[in-house]
């Protein structure tokens, strides 16, 4: 029964809710309209009521949470309608997990955006995929601009995202960062996507983390059981840090150093927590984490097998290293304040 409950949480976390396939809505939608981030409804309603009371912020970008869907005229659409309550509910499962991780130490802000659908990723990185993703990024850029100008109020901040959200974080660092804003960037956590050498060479704000305390860096990794779990989307990836021991070489991080693997329910409550269960070591050939202590069968999500085959732990990456990541956010925040003042 416990295993069954965890599997349910996994599906909620990644938002692979099969009822989203082909849903129709009761009114006309137009996903071509840019989202309005002056409207509070365009933002996730935080579980934490004391927004802006902490010393640092996190700007979080959700992963892919919806499938292709039809509007009331029968048109098949490939981007989220952020005003659709069922689609918002699908996104919230992933956002609740992220808020639980980042929100204990930071003010938590997460925009709803016209993210692309699961099916759109089968086209990556072709022109049609890019057209759809450009719609998503136009929202993210607008939301980030509004956040910096009207919400941040000069505080240090963290950028974070998983999967599609990680890709969006990477693109924000490429296109929407400047020196003044970068001075306040504690770190970025684009987890669950790839970064190639050309991107690193051509973008000065894409700086891979080397330890647990460096600042203005990107903390990125992808988790698999072995080569069988490698995703085609990880091709040419060059960035990986081990979130258990914060090494970038092949030093093995045994499970005793894992502070806690945590699974969260849709209401933010902890469904299960276990310290010392997951170990990991970087494989330098592919720049991914090889994970020990997790079952490929248990965490397999067949709905995304073409993107992430059995043996990939893409869905569980926040969960597996939850307490280590949570502590690292605090450690880097303290490091930022110690170096600035």
Q: Residue ranges of each PLM-predicted region?
A:
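Acidic helix-start/capping segments at beta-turn-to-alpha-helix junctions
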Residues: 114-118, 162, 192-193
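Surface cap/lid and interfacial helix-loop subdomains adjacent to catalytic sites
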Residues: 136-153, 174-322, 326-331, 335, ...
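Loop/turn elements at helix/coil->beta-strand transitions in domains of secreted/extracellular proteins
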Residues: 54-56, 104-108, 153-156, 183-187
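Gly/Ala-rich beta-loop-alpha elbow adjacent to hydrolase catalytic centers
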Residues: 161-165, 169
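N-terminal low-complexity, Ser/Thr- and acidic-residue-enriched intrinsically disordered segments
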Residues: 25-86
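Bacterial Sec-dependent N-terminal signal peptides
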Residues: 1-28
């Amino acid at each position: 029964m416990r295993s069954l409950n965890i599997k349910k949480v996994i599906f909620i976390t990644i938002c692979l809710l099969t009822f989203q396939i082909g849903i129709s809505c009761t009114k006309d939608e137009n996903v071509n309209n840019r989202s309005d981030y002056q409207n509070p409804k365009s933002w996730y309603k935080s579980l934490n009521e004391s927004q802006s009371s902490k010393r640092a912020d996190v700007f979080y970008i959700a992963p892919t949470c919806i499938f292709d869907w039809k509007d009331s005229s029968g048109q098949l659409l490939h981007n989220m309608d952020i005003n659709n309550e069922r689609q918002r509910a699908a996104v919230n499962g992933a956002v609740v997990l992220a808020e639980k991780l980042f929100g204990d130490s930071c003010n938590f802000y997460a925009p709803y955006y016209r993210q692309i659908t699961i099916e759109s990723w089968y086209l990556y990185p072709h022109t049609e995929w890019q057209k759809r993703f450009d719609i998503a990024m136009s929202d993210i850029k607008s939301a980030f601009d509004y956040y910096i100008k009207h919400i941040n109020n000069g505080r240090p901040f963290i950028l974070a995202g998983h999967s599609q959200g990680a890709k969006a974080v990477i693109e924000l660092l490429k296109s929407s960062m400047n020196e003044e804003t970068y001075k306040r960037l504690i770190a970025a956590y684009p987890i669950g996507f790839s970064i190639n050498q050309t991107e690193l060479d051509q973008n000065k704000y894409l700086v891979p983390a080397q330890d647990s305390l460096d600042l203005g860096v990107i903390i990125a990794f992808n988790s698999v059981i072995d080569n069988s779990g490698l995703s085609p989307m990880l091709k040419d990836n060059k960035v990986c840090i081990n979130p258990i021991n914060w090494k970038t070489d092949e030093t093995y991080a045994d499970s005793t150093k894992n502070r806690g693997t945590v699974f969260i329910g849709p209401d933010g409550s902890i469904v299960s927590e276990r310290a010392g269960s997951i170990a990991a070591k970087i494989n330098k050939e592919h720049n991914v984490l090889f994970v020990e202590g997790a079952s490929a069968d248990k965490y397999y999500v067949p709905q995304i097998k073409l993107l992430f085959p059995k043996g990939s732990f893409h869905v569980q990456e926040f969960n597996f290293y939850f307490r280590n990541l949570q502590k690292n956010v605090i450690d880097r925040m303290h490091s930022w304040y110690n170096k600035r003042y």
